[in-house]
Design a protein with these regions (language model features):
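N-terminal subdomain of lithium-sensitive/metallo-dependent phosphomonoesterases centered on the IMPase/IPPase/PAP
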Residues: 3-95
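Residue-level signal for inorganic ion chemistry
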Residues: 28, 53, 64, 98, ...
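Short glycine/threonine-rich catalytic loop with a Thr-x-Gly-x-Asp
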Residues: 53, 101-104, 194-197, 201
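DPxDG-like acidic metal-binding loop motif
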Residues: 84-143
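Short, solvent-exposed loop/turn motifs
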Residues: 120, 148-150
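An extended, acidic
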Residues: 150-209
Length: 209
C-alpha cells in the first residue's frame, strides 16, 4: 500500500545514503549493460561481477567516508573497517543479487545501513535499473522514492505471497534439500504462491511495500 502524504523531509543521514547509492549506481548500470558481452569473453562473467562488486563497494565507501569521516564500515568484500567513532558504522552490500546481475536480470540492489551502538538507525535499498529507492529511518516510517509505504493488510497465509531463497545443490546434504522442497510444498498448498526473486534485500523491501 502506497501513500503520498505525511512525508517528512529526508534527514542529513538519509540524504548522504541516497547520494552515495545514486553515484555508485552510475558505473554499476554501465557494468550491467556490458554483461551480455562477457558471456563469450575469456575473462568470463563471474570475474567481471567480482570486479563490479569491489568497484561499487569502493565507490560507496569513498562517498560515505567523505560525508561521515569518523564512521567505520562492515563491508561484504573488504570486511570490517573500524572508524574513529567506535559507536557508528556503515554496513554495505554493493550488489545484492549478483546471480541476477550476471545473467542480465534487473533484480539486484545496492544495500546500505547505518548502525549506532549496535542498532540499525537507517537503511536504504536501491534497485538502480528501475530507479526504486526504498529507505527508512527509525521513527520516521518507510518510503519508496517519495511515497510512504506500509505493509499489506493481508492477515492469512491463503491471501499472501511468500518470498524465499533456494539453497545451492552444492551446499548441504541431499536430505537438507529434500526437507526444503517438502517445506516449499507445504507452504504452496496453503498460500497464494511462492516467489524467488534472487535478491533478499529486495524481497524484504517488497514485503515492507
Amino acid at each position: 500500500k502506497k501513500e503520498t502524504y505525511n512525508m517528512p523531509p529526508q534527514s542529513a543521514l538519509i540524504t548522504v545514503m541516497v547520494n552515495a547509492a545514486r553515484k555508485a549506481s552510475i558505473r554499476l548500470k554501465r557494468d550491467y549493460g556490458e554483461v551480455d558481452q562477457l558471456q563469450v569473453s575469456k575473462k568470463g562473467p563471474a570475474d567481471f561481477v567480482t570486479a563490479a562488486d569491489i568497484r561499487t563497494e569502493k565507490l560507496l565507501r569513498e562517498e560515505l567516508s567523505h560525508a561521515r569521516p569518523g564512521f567505520g564500515f562492515l563491508l561484504e568484500e573488504a570486511g570490517e573497517k573500524p572508524g574513529e567513532d567506535p559507536h557508528r558504522r556503515w554496513i554495505i552490500d554493493p550488489i545484492d543479487g549478483t546471480t541476477n546481475f550476471v545473467h542480465g536480470i534487473a533484480q539486484f540492489a545496492i544495500s546500505i545501513a547505518a548502525e549506532e551502538n549496535g542498532e540499525i538507525t537507517a537503511g536504504l535499498i536501491f534497485e538502480p535499473i528501475n530507479e526504486e529507492m526504498f529507505w527508512a529511518e527509525r521513527g520516521q516510517g518507510a518510503y519508496l522514492n517519495d511515497r510512504r509505504i506500509r505493509v499489506s493488510s493481508r492477515s492469512t497465509m491463503a491471501q499472501s505471497l511468500f518470498a524465499t531463497g533456494i539453497p545451492f545443490m552444492g551446499r548441504g546434504t541431499e536430505e537438507d534439500h529434500d526437507k526444503f522442497l517438502a517445506e516449499m510444498k507445504a507452504v504452496m498448498s496453503v498460500s497464494a504462491g511462492i516467489r524467488r526473486f534472487g535478491s533478499a534485500a529486495l524481497d524484504l523491501a517488497y514485503v515492507a511495500a
